[in-house]
Design a protein with these regions (language model features):
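Intrinsically disordered, low-complexity boundary segments flanking structured domains
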Residues: 1-5, 127-130
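Active-site HxH/HxHxD metal-binding segment of metal-dependent hydrolases
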Residues: 44-47, 53-148
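Short N-terminal helix-initiation segments at or just after the protein's N-terminus
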Residues: 2-7, 88-92
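Conserved beta-strand hairpin/beta-sheet module of binuclear metal-dependent hydrolase folds
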Residues: 3-62
Length: 148
């Protein structure tokens, strides 16, 4: 199990405003280990994957870290390894493309149990707004307040 409370002094944080609804996806990397968590990866999964792996394509809208492989190595940051997917809640724009990220990364997906039902409605909710998302994913681990 991954400890999601990444206790680092200077985490590398990137924000992506993704999808037609411009939802904010955060990518947080521990600069000492390269461990990376993707938060709310509900849209444009390929954009996120391409950037995390090779700094290719349209990068983040904001970052406090390197913007190329060369800058990453110059900063002595290890190669990134996605260790978990996490959602703040299960609106379709936040969780709709989690299945695509789960295919790309063999990692656990964390979601609060109160959002399980909402997640089952992701496709139906998306269609109401004219969007299509894959069949909803099922969380691997339930987030609980105060637990690590």
């Amino acid at each position: 199990m991954v400890r999601l409370a990444m206790a680092v002094k200077e985490p590398w944080v990137e924000y992506f405003f993704v999808g037609i609804l411009q939802m904010r996806c955060s990518v947080v990397t521990d600069v000492t280990t390269g461990d990376t968590v993707i938060i709310d990866g509900g849209a444009e999964p390929q954009r996120i994957i391409d950037w995390v792996h090779s700094f290719s394509g349209k990068g983040p809208d904001w970052t406090n870290g390197p913007r190329s492989t060369e800058e990453m190595h110059e900063s002595s940051i290890p190669t990134r390894t996605v260790v978990a997917l996490l959602n703040t809640h299960a609106h379709f724009d936040h969780s709709g493309h989690i299945p695509d990220l789960k295919k790309a990364y063999d990692v656990d997906w964390y979601l609060h149990p109160d959002d399980t039902y909402l997640q089952t409605l992701a496709q139906k909710s998306a269609l109401r707004y004219g969007f299509e998302v894959p069949e909803p994913a099922v969380a691997d681990i339930s987030l609980q307040a105060g637990k690590q």
